[in-house]
Design a protein with these regions (language model features):
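Carbohydrate-interacting/catalytic domains
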Residues: 1-264
Length: 264
């Protein structure tokens, strides 16, 4: 993976070794043709040779050029899932937990691959850069800055309104429209304090990027218990147009593929 988050045009020797180690663990723990206790050395060697050949960086290899576009599409959908999971984790009832290094995209495999050292200097530099970044600039998602931005904004908001997250009730919200099944939404409310969380799911049905008019007529219905005066998005600080206590996803997700609406 390059510094900008884009994949390398060809696999490096280090990457090949990581995939071989991952496959060895998967095969041994499946215990079908080889295992840790009874290793099949020929089978293990054949697996390593197979991985080395399909990831051969030479021009003779026709597999990698076919794999890359598929991997890039999966990565985009995976990024949306990661953002949704992170937002739900930070706003749902309970205490959120973020594994070290996962403040941005983490391309680690299972252990021992996920025990590699975390580049904290890079994350520190990215965090400092957020002070001048605009939401639209974060649409270049491969570098992972959009995830760090989400975490920073929500954790700061949680700290400022701790009671809302500690004691606020959870209210599931209903979506309607063309892509009603492709979003999840809920509110947290404590007396006159509230937030409404909106995040995508099944994003391949909507298309990429998951913003603006792709959502068509999809809306979230807001409960009567929420005072909607001065409602705005936490991430973009934009006021949101509301009609009949409904918010259109084309408005709420016009810049970023997630939203936290609040009047605080």
């Amino acid at each position: 993976m390059q510094a900008n988050g884009e994949p390398e045009p060809m696999p490096s020797p280090e990457y090949v070794e990581r995939i071989q180690a991952y496959m060895a663990k998967a095969l041994h723990e499946a215990k079908i043709n080889t295992s840790w206790i009874q290793p099949n050395l020929q089978w293990d060697a054949a697996m390593r040779d197979f991985i080395a050949k399909i990831l051969d960086p030479s021009s003779r290899n026709k597999f990698v050029p076919i794999l890359l576009p598929v991997a890039q599409e999966i990565a985009r959908l995976g990024a949306i899932n990661s953002l949704t999971q992170t937002l739900l984790k930070l706003t749902s009832p309970g205490v959120p937990d973020i594994y070290q290094g996962n403040e941005v995209w983490d391309y680690s495999l299972v252990d021992p691959d996920n025990r590699r050292a975390v580049d904290y200097n890079r994350r520190r530099d990215m965090l400092q850069a957020l002070s001048t970044a605009t939401p639209r600039e974060l649409q270049t998602w491969p570098d992972g800055q959009i995830k760090l931005f989400l975490i920073q904004r929500v954790l700061r908001f949680r700290r400022e309104h701790a009671d809302l997250f500690r004691r606020g009730e959870y209210l599931p919200l209903r979506a309607s429209g063309t892509f009603s099944e492709c979003c999840v939404s809920f509110a947290r409310r404590l007396v006159n304090k509230w937030i409404v969380v909106i995040a995508p799911r099944f994003s391949s049905r909507v298309g990429f990027p998951l913003v603006d008019e792709r959502w068509k007529d999809t809306v979230i219905e807001l409960p009567e218990t929420l005072s909607l005066a001065q409602a705005h998005d936490l991430f973009t600080c934009r006021p949101l147009p509301l009609r009949d206590r409904k918010v259109k996803l084309a408005d709420a997700l016009s810049i970023l593929p997630f939203a936290v609406i609040t009047s605080l």
